[in-house]
């Protein structure tokens, strides 16, 4: 991901993601849409990268998105639990500036991706 680019929001119904940023730095935002979860409707941020190595497990029904922060391109690796189904993708999206999730990606007005 290029600096200041935002890729958000999406979630999966079946798939669990396991993500790490191996070069550069990204801000990962998570929004829990799982009814009955103790963290239902909560937002979390995780900064991760080559200087802050973490592996984040993202369960189904948790919206997530990234913003590359810093001056260099960021590289993210994902190891999902499901193979990609081209005929019926397990991916559901919202725009970065959706009103359904009260989160500010720091985008200029009208700009969808930095």
Residue ranges and their predicted role:
Residues 1-55, 69-114:
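Non-catalytic, conserved peripheral segments adjacent to functional cores
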Residues 53-65:
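Conserved SET/PR-domain catalytic core that frames the SAM/AdoMet-binding pocket
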